[in-house]
């Protein structure tokens, strides 16, 4: 497809589809049922990893701080999905529907039920 890796002006589906995985042991699930239930509740929702990782890790670790935003944590029942952005080759965030994705990449996103836009 003649694309270079990260920060292509117009990315391909393969640059946008980054798995977000959380594994919990049986002991963790029993010890932290609220976080476990929240993760289960949010498991099919789209995640903007760059925005959610920090806040999700705080929630999963039971860390309380003024910096934690529950609406960004997949381990919170207050998690809210947000539009997905792509950081372009000029280091600027652009909405997925504003970057000129190719039709085959849009179809890949839709087939995998990834939020677009």
Task: Write out the residue ranges for each language-model feature.
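Catalytic domains that recognize anionic headgroups
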Residues: 1-117
């Amino acid at each position: 497809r003649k694309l270079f890796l990260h920060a292509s002006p117009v990315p391909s589906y393969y640059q946008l589809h980054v798995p977000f995985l959380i594994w919990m042991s049986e002991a963790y699930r029993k010890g932290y049922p609220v976080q476990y239930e929240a993760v289960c509740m949010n498991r099919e929702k789209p995640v903007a990893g760059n925005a959610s990782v920090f806040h999700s890790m705080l929630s999963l670790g039971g860390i309380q701080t003024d910096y934690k935003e529950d609406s960004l944590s997949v381990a919170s029942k207050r998690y809210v999905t947000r539009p997905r952005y792509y950081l372009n080759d000029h280091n600027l965030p652009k909405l997925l529907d504003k970057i000129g994705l190719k039709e085959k990449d849009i179809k890949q996103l839709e087939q995998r039920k990834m939020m677009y836009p």
